[in-house]
A protein has these predicted regions:
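Short, structured segments at the rim of ligand-binding sites
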Residues: 1-241
Length: 241
């Protein structure tokens, strides 16, 4: 139900809300991306009801949305699933609660944070995912008037407000996109300069590329990478949540 204007030259997107907003997110819209489930929290928090299709998958595989639903249920949301659609509603408004996510989930963390901004009272969300994109989302919401405070590495406290205001915000760069270009340069012995991206966001990846032989120089918002003709192997690479 929004009006969206895209300025490709200035790389800007303007979103204008219509007076009447649809609270139905159809399968044709939601199936295109995993993040489609993220419309549930905002819709139920602001408009008190929502009908949204179960989200599409991604190359990582099928991932359930039970953490989203169970957590929002603790804030007062009632729902049922019928023919692939989540039918959700809340009486009056969502109410803040203390919620511990049973598993680290970027999407569930984002949905809860957004919903809590317009809920009544205080919400404490524990065992949050802490990807840079989540911190960026919080910065955007704070600029829009939300009251968000991190009180631990994986705990966030939110005091609900009546409404959020319109703002202008620059979204952080895409870590996956930037990392992909860096790896491509390393594999093809290329010489690449990436501008407009904070190198600290992929510091771990850049350090690994240095270990395989790439020469990397970084500035405030710039990465220079030159691939090596003698790519080295990394042994015992271990990742963690």
């Amino acid at each position: 139900g929004s009006v969206i204007k895209i300025d490709k030259k200035k790389k800007k997107i303007k979103i204008y809300k219509k007076n009447k907003v649809k609270t139905l997110a159809s399968y044709n819209l939601v199936k295109t991306m995993r993040a489609g489930i993220l419309v549930l929290g905002p819709l139920i928090a602001k408009y008190k009801n929502a009908v949204t299709s179960l989200p599409g998958g991604c190359s990582i595989g099928a991932r359930p949305v039970n953490h989203h639903l169970n957590s929002l249920k603790k804030m007062g949301m009632k729902y049922f699933i019928k023919k692939g659609y989540i039918h959700a509603k809340v009486n009056k408004t969502l109410v803040g609660n203390s919620i511990r996510l049973p598993k680290l989930s970027v999407g569930a963390t984002e949905n809860l944070i957004i919903a809590s901004c317009l809920a009544k009272g205080k919400s404490t969300i524990k065992n949050c995912a802490i990807e840079p994109e989540i911190k960026d989302l919080c910065n955007f919401l704070i600029k829009a008037g939300a009251k968000i405070k991190w009180i631990g590495k994986r705990t966030v406290e939110i005091i609900g407000v009546k409404s959020l205001k319109s703002v202008s915000y620059t979204v952080m760069g895409d870590r996956i996109e930037c990392g992909t270009f860096c790896v491509a340069a390393a594999l093809t012995q290329g010489n690449l300069k990436i501008k407009g991206f904070n190198p600290k966001l992929i510091n771990t990846e850049l350090n690994l590329l240095k270990k395989v032989g790439s020469k990397i120089k970084i500035k405030k918002d710039e990465i220079n990478i030159k691939g090596s003709h003698n790519i080295k192997c990394i042994n015992n690479l271990k990742t963690k949540e």
